[in-house]
Amino acid sequence: MPEQHLHIVSFDIPFPANYGGVIDVFYKAEALAKKGIQIHLHCFEYNREHSKELENLFFSVQYYKRNISKKQLFKSIPYIVSSRFSEALVLNLLKDDYPILLEGLHTSGLLDEPRLNGRKRIVRTHNIEHEYYQNLARVENDLFKKYYFYNESAKLKRYEKILSKSDMLLSISKNDEKYFSQHYNHVKFVPAFHPFKKVDSLIGKGDYVLYHGNLSVPENSNAAKFLVNNVFNDLDIPLKVAGLNPPAQLRNLFNNGKDIELIPNPDDKALNELIKHAHINISVTAQRTGLKLKLLNTLYNGRFCLVNDKMLSGSKLDDLCIVANDQWKMKQKIKSLFNEEFTKNKIDDRKEKLGVVYNNGNNVDQLIELVC
């Protein structure tokens, strides 16, 4: 059987795979490489270092500088797209006729490149981007950033029709698949790729609730504030909040002596221990689009998982989580769950259900059929 080659164009350098978007990019490319696909990885770089790990894993790795000039903000096309045009990338892609997998709307400018007409070009959609940016605008307090997010959202909504030029769209959630299928042909749901090999949850009980996330992101810091001020304000149950770069306004909430603890900038090992030993991992979001990969982390490694319904949207994980959409329901569910043991039966249920949808081995076989 002849060698199979695939170009993957990534919006960022996907290693270390330590935030939502690049987790799917890296583990998808790794799964393909382990199946013998020769991966030609093309990365736009901005504030991340070149990676020997990637260069050792894949057939070839190329890097391209993002054009982050403020002039890009005044173009009619979205900044996340216009800052990722590269003539060097086009010339590299023209050296052969291998199929091209474009990661996100961010890299979809290549769909408009006439020199690539006739090439198989597939887009992996990571979000419904205009909805994502609109939600970023809603929770942003800085006026300049708020204007930028609203403006980018409007541009993304207009620009999205470029996806009609792709050969196929690979959605990351069922919710996104439903949306894109209403507007475009050839849409397939391919679940997120991830690092988790097995369900590693502990039986028994923990003695705290954990919320974790990148706390420099306004949506996450707002969720943490909501939990402190509205859910745990009168609960006699400990809350730990862990994550990157918590803003001063959030830090100040943890100086009042309540049974709450802020753990800033935990390393991966410390965060994994916090997830594993919590009795409840709680996750809330204002975004319905995409897939929240931290939800998979808590299901593979934690005990009870309490979420709002937006966290589950299109994930096919509803049966494995407890849902509460307001502060009163959350208080009620937390009190109830603290009287329950996490049992082996629950772990077995997770193994079965996660293995059906989020099995990297099965999903990479489907991906190879679609893409290569």
Can you name each region flagged by the protein language model?
Residues F149-V199:
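Donor nucleotide-sugar binding/catalytic pocket of nucleotide-sugar-dependent glycosyltransferases
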Residues A88-L94, E129-Y132, E140-L169:
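Membrane-proximal helix-turn-helix segments that form the acceptor-binding/catalytic region
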Residues F189-N255, L262-K276:
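Conserved catalytic-core segment of nucleotide-activated headgroup transferases in glycan assembly
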Residues I100, N117-A137:
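Active-site proximal beta-strand in glycosyltransferases
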Residues K294-N297, F304-N308:
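Short hydrophobic beta-strand element within catalytic cores of glycosyltransferases
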Residues I275-G290, N301-F304:
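Acidic donor-binding loop of glycosyltransferase active sites
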Residues R84, N339-V371:
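A charged, aromatic-enriched C-terminal amphipathic alpha-helix characteristic of glycosyltransferases
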Residues M1-S60, K95:
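N-terminal subdomain of nucleotide-sugar transferases
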